[in-house]
Design a protein with these regions (language model features):
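Short active-site oxyanion
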Residues: 73-77, 97-99, 184, 244-246, ...
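Conserved acidic, metal-coordinating active-site core of Asp-based
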Residues: 140-249, 253-260
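Active-site metal-binding loops of divalent metal-dependent hydrolases
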Residues: 49, 82, 250-252
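Active-site phosphate-binding/coordination module
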Residues: 60-162
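Non-catalytic pre-domain segments flanking phosphatase-related domains
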Residues: 1-47, 71
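Mg2+-dependent phosphoryl-transfer enzymes with acidic/Ser/Thr/Gly-rich catalytic loops
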Residues: 16, 33-34, 38, 42, ...
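Short, structured coil segments at secondary-structure junctions
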Residues: 94-97, 105, 204-207, 264-265, ...
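Hydrophobic packing residues within well-ordered alpha-helices of enzyme cores
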Residues: 62, 87-91, 197, 201, ...
Length: 302
């Protein structure tokens, strides 16, 4: 890349959009002082609605901003409700290889297994017996689509859904979903709204598990007491990072747990502007929307 060049003071130079982007990145990179070392942060980023848009392209500026944070010595990782199969590609695209990755809303923590390649292994898993929850939900949502994730990463599902990544997944009868302990249950009911799901879980009570309602009619259920925050506390401890040196960014109800964890420890919790009000209320700060590059804005300020 060519050396950053600014036009003389008082003049205006019109350049192509990509040239402008490259110029901003060059100037930002040159402004970084490698002689100034700060204590590293543990930065945990949600994926959907935080670093990527609905079409799974990256939020503006996020790739460059993650690189900026990495150059500053911070540990940038992902904490997502996705399975590992739906997460791996984003590590490669961001060009990061953190020591740990939190998936399945905290029920599975993966650890890097090879220093030279992007290879990870399941390091810690949480499971529960799904039979009571599945039976209860089926009574109220007989037409919903169900999927469970097992401790070894395999997934079992009842019906295909277009936006599900079904690598390492098998279609089975509903009764087979509860044949062994699971890390999580995913329920999708296209005929219901997000508010319908919120009201349903309040009405029937899901007291023996943790759960989060997605921005569509999507219910994600994990073992009791397990969320992104509990998983990140394990990661923080393993890495030996000060509890106050954490920064988490997300947009959904499944991010509230890690928001609370960060704030209770004196860290930072940042919600995306387009998230539900209850999510923004749970965070200590609100950045701009994913469409406007909210994550990049936060990371560039470090």
């Amino acid at each position: 890349m060519s050396e950053a060049h600014l036009p003389p003071t008082g003049s205006v130079e019109v350049v192509p959009e990509q040239t402008a982007v490259d110029l901003v990145e060059d100037v930002a990179r040159e402004a970084e002082d490698p002689g100034i070392r700060t204590e590293p942060l543990l930065i945990a980023l949600d994926i959907d609605g935080t670093i990527i848009l609905e079409d799974e392209t990256f939020s503006p500026g996020v790739v460059e901003a993650v690189a900026h944070a990495h150059r500053a010595g911070h540990e940038v990782m992902l904490a997502t409700g996705r399975s590992w199969e739906g997460t791996e590609e984003f590590l490669a695209s961001l060009n990061i290889a953190p020591e740990f990755v939190v998936t399945s809303n905290g029920a599975i923590i993966l650890r890097k297994s090879d220093a030279d390649v992007l290879a990870y292994e399941r390091f810690h898993t949480e499971t529960f017996d799904p039979i009571e929850v599945l039976t209860l939900l089926r009574e109220h949502l007989p037409d919903a689509k169900y999927m469970v994730e097992l401790a070894d990463g395999r997934r079992l599902y009842t019906e295909h859904l277009g936006d599900w990544n079904l690598e390492h997944a098998d279609r089975v009868p509903f009764e087979q979903l509860s044949s062994m302990p699971v890390c999580r249950i995913v329920v999708v009911s296209p005929g219901d709204t997000e508010q319908d799901f919120v009201e349903l879980v309040e009405r029937i009570g899901l007291n023996e598990v943790s759960y989060a309602v997605g921005w569509t009619a999507w219910l994600d259920i994990a073992p009791q007491g397990v969320d992104k925050g509990t998983a990140l506390e394990r990661v923080r401890s393993w890495l030996g990072i000060d509890p106050a040196r954490v920064l988490v960014i997300g947009d959904g109800r499944n991010d509230v747990g890690m928001f609370r964890w960060a704030l209770e420890n004196g860290g930072r919790a940042v919600a995306m502007e387009q998230g539900p009000q209850e999510v923004r209320d749970a965070a200590g700060e609100v950045t701009t929307s994913v469409q406007a590059g909210g994550v990049a804005e936060v990371l560039r300020s470090l």
